[in-house]
């Protein structure tokens, strides 16, 4: 039988068995002419392990596994077991406890509230996204590519009304409907929450029990492959939320897997998250690192995923994250840095990006930790991108203000450019900002009625012009009124009202410009691609800046007015004696403006302004945005 060889054990013990999912778990195979399933599990502290399942009446003595030393791997081949069979591992501990555990390497899981693993063949799907994958492989610098991400919770994007199964769209239904919407709007990527299997809907997928299995809420592993394949065929990239920071204590899960701390740190001061009530992975244990890295590789290489957004990175980097004095243990140098987690990130990111050019590793990191996107050999963590939480906080604080008080907080919208070159940033307005009484994006805006919509449109316009890749959570591009809830679909009926359509049309046009002009994404992380025209018009709360192209042509000039005051002849200094073509005017009727006719071309006049020899004059509406190409 011996599928798990000495070399397999050596590599697993070193933390470098990158195809580990092909060895551990459940695998359909034929031995000596007999078809069945080979099972293998890592449980070094166990006294004995059996496989129980639908094929043996869940009898604990029917299929006892053989222990392989020195790693404590248990294996067995069960004739007659087949695809779609349910199973668990029955573990007896030296002190007599009996544990019933799901398979950590399961390719498929029983639909909640069931907690069994499911035998699945994930090798039979015939992919048809070779053009996308070939192009991905040839992408030399993902930082120079457009990235406008639509963040989606699959279970609450749209639902079928009146069905008993929660009305979830299947992976195959989502593929079609989501692609249609994303293509119409102009997003380049979809970021999916809650794909790795998880038991509790209310965790949104951030308390994972199945690191190798797409959730069964929306279909089978093959259905999920179809979803990825379909989006790729329509030139849409896919990013998954991935959670190596912690895992839940559910009895069937990874916690105390073989009767002792196996996947988590044994010392509760390192192995527990007091705030979240979860366990922390032991990043110093090679087999645990291998488990996590193997999961990441599975999604990227087997499921063709284009990027992983790594959740809660700060909680991994700091030993004292969310903990009081006495609740944490310092490292060998007496510091609060988790040296093992740092090494894990460098290994993970260098490996994934080295084996898979064109794949993005994205950090949700909320502190000022240096060089998150710096190269590992220079002391960085080697992520491709980092969420810019600092920009997001300043931006939202500014937007919530009554326009009268914005002049005293003008710096909040310019500060991010002072550190923009320090990392490769993504500007994010994620699901976290529209839950827990934080209000929807629309209801964060000051004023009443029309004012809220006008504020939101100028906010999105500024965000799209600002350097950095972009992420917007679903529902915010239609000015969702309510906070998001995983228990219901988005309020699509709002699009029956013109104010909501105006916001959607504004976003659609901004995304069109974003994708059309390389100056909007090629030099996001350096000053070659950006220049302030006037960052200091505090009294009027107006910002003007340029997105510069590498060719000197097809540059864009942005002018954004954050007050309800119309500026009849607002003058803007310009860098060159050229004609400036108006390509976006927020006062256009389809965006909810007055529809007033304006010149489409503005010739630079030799009139010094903003420290420049030439300038143009423009009638800037209340909460108005103008974008000029030159």
Model feature map: region roles:
Residues 1-146, 171-182, 186, 450-453, ...:
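Carbohydrate-interacting/catalytic domains
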Residues 43-45, 69, 80, 153-158, ...:
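Short, flexible loop/turn elements at secondary-structure junctions
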Residues 53, 78, 91, 194, ...:
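Glycine-rich, histidine-containing beta strand-loop boundary motifs that form or position
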Residues 97-99, 158-160, 198-201, 246-250, ...:
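Short catalytic/ligand-binding loop motif for oxyanion handling, primarily in non-cytosolic enzymes
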Residues 110, 132-144, 153-337, 618:
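Substrate-binding/active-site clefts of carbohydrate-active enzymes
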Residues 213-217, 332-339, 448-450, 494-501:
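A short acidic, glycine-rich active-site loop
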Residues 304-306, 324-486, 515-572, 576-587, ...:
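Conserved alpha/beta catalytic core and glycan-binding cleft of carbohydrate-active enzymes
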């Amino acid at each position: 039988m011996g599928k798990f060889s000495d070399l397999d054990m050596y590599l697993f013990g070193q933390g470098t068995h990158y195809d580990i999912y092909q060895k551990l778990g459940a695998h359909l195979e034929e031995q000596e002419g007999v078809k069945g399933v080979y099972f293998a599990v890592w449980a070094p502290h166990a006294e004995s392990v059996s496989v129980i399942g639908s094929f043996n009446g869940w009898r604990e003595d029917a299929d006892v596994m053989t222990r392989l030393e020195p790693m404590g791997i248990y294996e067995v081949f069960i004739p007659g077991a087949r695809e779609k069979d349910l199973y668990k591992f029955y573990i007896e501990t030296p002190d007599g406890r009996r544990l019933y555990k799901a398979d950590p390497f399961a390719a498929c899981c029983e639909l909640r509230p069931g907690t069994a693993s499911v035998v699945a063949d994930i090798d039979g799907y015939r992919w048809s996204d070779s053009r996308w994958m070939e192009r991905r492989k040839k992408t030399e610098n993902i930082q120079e590519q457009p990235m406008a991400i639509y963040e989606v919770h699959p279970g609450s994007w749209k639902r079928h009304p009146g069905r008993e199964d929660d009305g979830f769209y299947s992976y195959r239904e989502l593929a079609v409907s989501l692609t249609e919407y994303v293509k119409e709007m102009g997003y380049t990527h979809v970021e999916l929450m809650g794909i790795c299997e998880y038991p509790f809907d209310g965790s949104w997928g951030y308390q994972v029990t199945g690191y190798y299995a797409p959730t069964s809420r929306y279909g089978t592993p093959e259905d999920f492959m179809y979803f990825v394949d379909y989006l790729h065929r329509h030139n849409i990239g896919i990013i998954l939320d991935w959670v190596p920071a912690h895992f839940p204590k559910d009895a069937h899960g990874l916690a105390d897997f073989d009767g002792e701390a196996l996947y988590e740190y044994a010392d509760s001061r390192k192995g527990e998250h007091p705030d979240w009530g979860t366990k922390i992975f032991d990043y110093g244990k090679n087999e645990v690192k291998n488990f996590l890295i193997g999961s990441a590789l599975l999604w990227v290489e087997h499921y063709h995923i284009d990027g992983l957004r790594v959740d809660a990175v700060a909680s991994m980097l700091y030993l004292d994250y969310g903990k009081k004095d006495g609740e944490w243990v310092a490292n060998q140098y007496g510091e609060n840095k988790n040296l093992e987690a740092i090494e894990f990130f460098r290994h993970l990111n260098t490996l994934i990006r080295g084996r898979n050019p064109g794949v993005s590793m994205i950090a949700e990191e909320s502190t000022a930790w240096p060089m998150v996107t710096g190269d590992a050999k220079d002391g960085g963590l080697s992520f491709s991108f980092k969420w810019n939480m600092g920009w997001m906080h300043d931006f939202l604080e500014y937007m919530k203000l009554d326009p009268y008080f914005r002049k005293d907080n003008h710096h909040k919208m310019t500060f991010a450019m002072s550190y923009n070159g320090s990392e490769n940033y993504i500007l994010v307005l994620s699901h976290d900002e529209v839950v827990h009484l934080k209000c929807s994006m629309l209801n964060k805006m000051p004023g009443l009625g029309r004012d809220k919509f006008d504020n939101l449109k100028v906010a999105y316009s500024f965000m799209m012009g600002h350097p950095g890749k972009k992420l917007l959570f679903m529902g915010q591009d239609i000015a969702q009124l309510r906070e998001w809830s995983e228990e219901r679909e988005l309020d699509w009926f709002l699009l029956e009202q013109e104010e909501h359509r105006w916001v959607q049309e504004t976003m659609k046009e901004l995304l069109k410009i974003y994708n059309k002009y390389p100056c909007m994404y090629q030099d996001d992380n350096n000053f070659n691609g950006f220049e302030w025209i006037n960052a200091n018009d505090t009294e009027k709360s107006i910002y003007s800046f340029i997105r510069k192209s590498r060719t000197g042509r097809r540059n864009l000039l942005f002018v954004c007015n954050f007050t309800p005051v119309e500026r009849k002849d607002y003058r803007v200094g310009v860098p060159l004696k050229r004609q400036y073509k108006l390509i976006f005017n927020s006062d256009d009727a389809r965006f909810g403006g007055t529809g007033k006719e304006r010149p489409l071309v503005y010739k630079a006049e030799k009139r010094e302004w903003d420290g420049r020899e030439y300038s143009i004059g423009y009638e800037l509406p209340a909460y108005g945005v103008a974008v000029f190409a030159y």
